[in-house]
Amino acid sequence: MPGQLQLSFVTFKKDAFIVVEGKNNVERFFIINQGKVRISKEVQVVAEEGGNILGPGDFFGVVSSMSSHSHIETARAVTDVVLISVHREQYSELIQKNTPVAMKVILQFSRRLRYLDEALSRLTLKSSALPDISHLFNVAEYYARQSQYKQAFYAYAKYLEHCPSGANAGAARERMMKIAPYVTDVKTSFGPEEFNRMYRKDTMLFAEEEPGDELFVIQKGAVKIVKIVDNKEVLLAVLKAGDIFGEMALLEAKPRVASAIAYEDCQVLAVNRANFQRMIATQSQLIAKLTTLLADRIWFIYKQLANTLITDPAGRLYDILCIQLEKNRIPFNSTASFTFDFGPKELANMVGLPQAEVNSALRKMIEKKKIQIVNNKVHAPMVIEIIKQTESQRKMQKIEEARKEYRAQTIIGL
C-alpha cells in the first residue's frame, strides 16, 4: 500500500559478515530481531561503552548509513541472526511511527558523541579537565583580556548566576561594572515562550560549562563553536542556516562542552526538552536531520581518533587530509584539484602535533609536489595523489606494526 512503511527481514548464518569496515554499501542500517552480532574495528581507538556484542533491539550501521560515509566498523554474526533492514530514506517514516526507536538512536548517538569527543580532546587538544562550572569565570577572563566585552559580559553573568557565592564572585561583579558601558545587545536570559531569538554579531548564545536545556536551529546567519584550551580560543566549527547545535546538553542534561557565539547577526529557533518530545512525533524530517548531524560527527571523530594512532607525522597529515576529502564528499579517484578551508595552523590543531613538526612534514610534502599552500590554505593539485600517499603511509605503518609484534613474540619465545 502506498504510504505504508515496508521494512524487510534479512537472515545471516553464524560467522557471516554483515557489514565490513571501509566499504561504501551504506544505504541501509540494521536492527537486530533475533540473535547476536559482534562489532569490531580494524583499529580499536577507544573502548566502546556497552561492549561490542549486540542483541535483539540493538542497531548497527546507522552512523555510516545516515552520514552516507564509509563503514567505520565490521559487523559479524555471532549466532544465526534475523535483522530488520532499514533504508536511510525510510528513517523519517520509521521515527514518525515509532518514537521510542528515534529516542533510542538519538540518545545513544549523543552519549557516544560526548564520550568520543572527550577522548579526542584528551589526545589532540590535550585537555582532560572534568566539568567545572567555575570555569565560566576563566572563559570570561579570557574574552576580557581580548577586549571582547560582549562575550566576557555574558560569561561573567552566567558565572554569577550559577556561582553567586563563588571564589571569584566579587571579581566578576567588579569586572561586569567596568565593561558594562562597552556592552550593547547582550541578553543573558530569555522567557519560556521566547523560542525565536535574534543575536547580534559577537554575542554569546551559551558558554562552555554552562548548564543547558535547549538545542538551536539556525534560521538565518552563522554561529561559531569555540572552546578555550590552554588559554587559547580553538575554533571547532562555523555553522550556517539549517544547522543544529547544542543538542548534547539538552539530551543528556550535562554542561555545554563548548561556547556558541554569533559569527554574524543571526536568528535561531530554540527547542527545549518539552518541545523536543513533541518534535519527535510531529517533525520527523527535523529529527532525521538531527540524527544525520550526530552520525556525521561520530563518523568524523572516529576517523580523527584513528588518526592519532599514526606515528609518522607525514602519514598523519595525509590521513587527515583524506578524512577531510571524504567528509566533503570529494571522489577519491578525482584528478581535479581541491583547496581545503584551513591552513597549516588549523592543520596542526587537527592532528594534535606541535606546529614545528607539522611545518617540517609539510615542507617535505610540498617538495614532493603533493600539496601547496595557497593564500594560507592547504591546496591539493590532484586529489588522487593525496589518496595514494595516504594508502602508502597506512601500508608502511601496518608493516612496521607487524615487525614490532614479530620482534616482541620472538623475545617472549626466547
At which residue positions do the language-model features occur?
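Phosphate-/nucleic-acid-contacting segments
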Residues: 132-179, 320, 326-414
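Structural motif
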Residues: 36, 81-82, 222, 265-267, ...
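Regulatory nucleotide-sensing modules
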Residues: 1-42, 179-234
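Amphipathic alpha-helical repeat elements characteristic of tetratricopeptide repeat
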Residues: 85, 130-134, 138, 196, ...
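Short alpha-helical segments that sit at the start of domains
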Residues: 304-329
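TPR-adjacent "capping" and linker segments in tetratricopeptide-repeat scaffold/adaptor proteins
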Residues: 118-135, 188-189
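Cyclic-nucleotide recognition modules
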Residues: 49-106, 237-291, 299
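Short, structured interface segments
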Residues: 94, 99-121, 163-183, 287-295
